[in-house]
C-alpha cells in the first residue's frame, strides 16, 4: 500500500523551478568544501512529529486523519506507520531518521509486553532499513509521556519508576545499536521540578548522574560505538529542567565525571526558550568540547513554549553552520528535523512542503557559511583581536609564568596604560551579510 502515491520522488530542479515539490537549492551531490551537501548535512526526519502526532494541542483534539493512525491492532498499525515513514523518507531522499521507542512500537500494558512489541518492531525496522538504504541517526526512549513519569524518570522519588526507565533505555539503546544507529539521545523532559517545596535537588541530581553512569556502562558493555547525547532544554514540561542549556549540561557532566562520555544534541527552539541564540549554543558546545548533533527547527520568539516549527531563516542557520564548518563538521551527528507541520496543515502534501522548504534553507545556509569559512575574514579579525595573547607576554601569563602579585608588580613597574581597541562589530556584521546575500 502506498500512502503518498500521488506525490513524486523529490528531485533537485534548481532555483528557477516553481515546482513546490522539488528542491530548489538542495543538490545532494553538489560539493562544498570537499564534501557533498548530503555528507555535510546528514539530514534526518523524526518519527514523532511526522508520523505519530495526531494534530492535537492542549485546547483541541487531533486534527489529522492519517491512514496509518486509524483504529485497529496496535502492532499492525505500528507496521503500517513504519511503511508510511519509509515511503516518506525514500521519496524525500533523506538518508537518516530518528525515533523514540514508543513512536515505533505500542507500549502495551506491562513492561514485558512493551519489550516484546518493541523487539518485533525493531526487526521490522531493520527490514525496512535494509530495503530502503535509510539509516538510523539516533534512537531514544520516551521517558516523559506516560503518567508514571509525572515526577521524572531518573529523578523520580520512586525507585521502581527509575527501574522501569532503566529497562526502557536498556532496550532502546540495544535497539539503536542493532539498527546501526550513530548516536543515542537522552532528553530529560521530566528530569526537573515543578516546585522546590517537595524537591531534594541534590538527591535528584545524584540519581540522574547514577542513571547516566549506568547508560555509559551499558554502552561500553554492548560495544555501541556511537555517541551518547543529552538534549538541553530549560523548561517544558517541567518548570525547571536539570539539562537547562549547554553550559549547565557541561557543568553537570564535569561534576559527575561524565564529560568524556556524553555530548549534547542542540535544538534551536530549546536555545530560544533558554534565552540564547542557536549560534550561542552551538559555539558554546564546541568551546566546551561537547558538540554532538543538532535538532533543526525554530521557535516563535513571541511565544514562551516549544512550537517546533520548520527552520526558515537562512540568516540564523548560516551562523550555526559557520561554527559547525569551522570546527570540522559533523562526525556522528546530523541535522534532525524535530519539526512539525501546523495543526491546520492537514494534507499529506504539507508534510513534504515543510521538509522540502527546510532542506532548501539548510542547503542555502551551509553554502553561505562555507563562503565565510573560505574567505577567512571573520576568523582573521578574531585572530587579530586576540593577537597580543600569542606574544611572549600573553603566553607567559597563560603558562603560569606570573603569580597574581608578580604580575601586579610588573604592571606597576612598566606603567601599563592600555587603550581600548574597537570590537568592529558593525564591520563583522557587514561581512556576514555580504556572504549571505551574495554581495561579496
UniProtKB/Swiss-Prot annotation:
InterPro entries, A to Z: Xyl_isomerase-like_sf, Xylose_isom_bac, Xylose_isomerase
The keyword Cytoplasm is assigned to this record: yes
Keywords for this protein: Carbohydrate metabolism, Cytoplasm, Isomerase, Magnesium, Metal-binding, Xylose metabolism
Active-site residues, record numbering mapped to chain: 100, 103
UniProt entry tagged with the keyword Isomerase: yes
Enzyme class: isomerase
CC annotations in GO: cytoplasm
EC numbers for this chain: 5.3.1.5
Cofactor requirements of the protein: Mg(2+)
Binding site for Mg(2+) 1: 231, 267, 295, 338
Gene Ontology terms for molecular function: magnesium ion binding; xylose isomerase activity
Binding annotation for Mg(2+) 2: 267, 270, 306, 308
Cofactor binding annotation: Binds 2 magnesium ions per subunit.
Record's subcellular location: Cytoplasm
Catalytic activity field: alpha-D-xylose = alpha-D-xylulofuranose
GO BP of this protein: D-xylose metabolic process
PANTHER family noted in UniProt: PTHR48408, XYLOSE ISOMERASE
Family of the protein in this entry: Belongs to the xylose isomerase family.
HAMAP family reported for this sequence: Xylose_isom_A
Summary of subunit composition and partner proteins: Homotetramer.
Protein's name according to its UniProt entry: Xylose isomerase
Gene designation per UniProt: xylA
Amino acid at each position: 500500500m502506498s500512502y503518498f502515491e500521488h506525490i513524486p520522488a523529490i528531485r533537485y530542479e534548481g532555483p528557477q523551478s516553481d515546482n513546490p515539490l522539488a528542491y530548489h537549492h538542495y543538490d545532494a551531490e553538489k560539493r562544498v568544501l570537499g564534501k557533498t551537501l548530503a555528507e555535510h548535512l546528514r539530514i534526518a526526519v523524526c518519527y514523532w512529529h511526522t508520523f505519530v502526532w495526531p494534530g492535537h494541542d492542549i485546547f483541541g483534539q487531533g486534527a489529522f486523519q492519517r491512514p496509518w493512525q486509524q483504529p485497529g491492532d496496535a502492532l499492525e498499525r505500528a507496521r503500517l506507520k513504519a511503511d508510511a515513514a519509509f515511503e516518506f523518507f525514500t521519496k524525500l531522499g533523506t538518508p537518516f531518521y530518528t525515533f523514540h521507542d514508543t513512536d515505533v512500537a505500542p507500549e502495551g500494558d506491562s513492561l514485558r509486553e512493551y519489550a516484546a512489541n518493541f523487539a518485533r518492531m525493531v526487526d521490522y525496522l531493520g527490514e525496512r532499513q535494509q530495503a530502503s538504504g535509510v539509516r538510523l541517526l539516533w534512537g531514544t526512549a520516551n521517558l516523559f509521556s506516560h503518567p508514571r513519569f509525572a515526577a521524572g524518570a531518573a529523578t523520580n522519588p520512586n525507585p521502581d519508576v527509575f527501574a522501569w526507565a532503566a529497562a526502557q533505555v536498556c532496550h532502546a539503546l540495544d535497539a539503536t545499536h542493532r539498527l546501526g544507529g550513530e548516536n543515542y539521545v537522552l532528553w530529560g523532559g521530566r528530569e526537573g521540578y515543578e516546585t522546590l517545596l517537595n524537591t531534594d535537588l541534590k538527591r535528584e541530581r545524584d540519581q540522574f548522574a547514577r542513571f547516566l553512569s549506568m547508560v555509559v556502562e551499558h554502552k561500553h558493555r554492548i560495544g555501541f560505538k556511537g555517541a551518547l547525547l543529552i538534549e538541553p532544554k530549560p523548561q517544558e514540561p517541567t518548570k525547571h529542567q536539570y539539562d537547562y542549556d549547554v553550559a549547565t549540561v557541561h557543568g553537570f557532566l564535569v561534576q559527575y565525571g561524565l564529560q568524556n562520555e556524553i555530548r549534547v544534541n542542540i535544538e534551536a527552539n530549546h536555545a530560544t526558550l533558554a534565552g540564547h541564540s542557536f549560534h550561542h549554543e552551538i559555539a558554546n558546545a564546541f568551546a566546551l568540547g561537547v558538540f554532538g548533533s543538532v535538532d533543526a527547527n525554530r521557535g516563535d520568539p513571541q511565544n514562551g513554549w516549544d512550537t517546533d516549527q520548520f527552520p526558515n531563516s537562512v540568516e540564523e542557520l548560516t551562523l550555526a553552520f559557520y561554527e559547525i564548518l569551522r570546527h570540522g563538521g559533523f562526525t556522528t551527528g546530523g541535522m534532525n528535523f524535530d519539526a512539525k507541520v501546523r495543526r491546520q496543515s492537514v494534507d499529506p502534501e504539507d508534510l513534504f512542503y515543510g521538509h522540502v522548504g527546510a532542506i532548501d534553507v539548510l542547503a542555502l545556509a551551509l553554502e553561505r557559511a562555507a563562503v565565510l569559512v573560505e574567505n577567512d575574514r571573520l576568523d582573521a579579525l578574531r585572530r587579530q583581536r586576540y593577537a597580543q595573547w600569542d606574544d611572549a607576554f600573553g603566553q607567559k601569563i597563560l603558562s603560569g609564568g606570573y603569580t597574581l602579585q608578580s604580575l601586579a608588580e610588573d604592571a606597576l613597574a612598566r606603567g601599563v596604560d592600555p587603550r581600548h581597541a574597537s570590537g568592529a562589530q558593525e564591520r563583522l556584521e557587514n561581512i556576514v551579510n555580504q556572504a549571505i546575500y551574495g554581495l561579496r
